[in-house]
């Protein structure tokens, strides 16, 4: 199993950012290494970390996304805020000091650049548009996603969409989900 430093060396050695150069971990190692990296402190508030949070939902990845560049040690209140979308992946990645995040595969397929992914995508793979509405992502029908959006007061901002495309970031919301 490679360490965080080894993953960074691999990235530097090949001269480009390769998020998948980070090794795929078991669930147990994902949690252990996440907590070790943060010294058991929440990366957002500095409190006691109790959850190894997937920055982007693990269901978005065919392999489960158990890589350290998709992990953040969070306390319970910050974990809840991250799950319901009040703390964004962009903010969490910055707090972790990660400059090579693991973007969900559907982001590239939709034509999103890494910076657009970080700026506009929530934990569940939905796109937040410039007008504040939300273009549903591939997990929109997932019970966990819908419960999180509802708990965060964001479910009413979603509109029904066909294909998930990068053009949805700035396009007007024709129909919003009621």
Go through the PLM ranges and name each one:
Residues 41-73, 82-93:
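Histidine-centered nuclease catalytic patch
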Residues 1-39, 46-49, 88-178:
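A boundary/linker detector
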């Amino acid at each position: 199993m490679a360490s965080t430093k080894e993953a960074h060396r691999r990235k530097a050695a090949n001269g480009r950012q390769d998020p998948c150069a980070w090794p795929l971990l078991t669930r147990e190692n994902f949690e252990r290494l996440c907590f070790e990296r943060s010294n058991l402190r929440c990366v957002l508030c500095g409190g006691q970390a109790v959850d190894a949070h997937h920055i982007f939902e693990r269901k978005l990845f065919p392999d489960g996304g158990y890589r350290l560049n998709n992990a953040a040690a969070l306390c319970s209140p910050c974990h809840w805020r991250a799950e319901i979308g009040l703390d964004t992946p962009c903010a969490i990645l910055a707090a972790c000091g990660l400059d090579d995040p693991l973007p969900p595969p559907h982001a590239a397929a939709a034509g999103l650049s890494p910076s657009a992914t970080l700026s506009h995508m929530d934990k569940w793979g939905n796109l937040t548009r410039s007008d504040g509405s939300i273009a549903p992502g591939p997990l929109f029908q997932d019970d966990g996603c819908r419960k999180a959006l509802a708990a965060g007061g964001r479910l009413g901002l979603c509109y029904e969409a066909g294909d998930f495309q990068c053009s949805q970031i700035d396009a007007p919301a024709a129909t919003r989900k009621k």
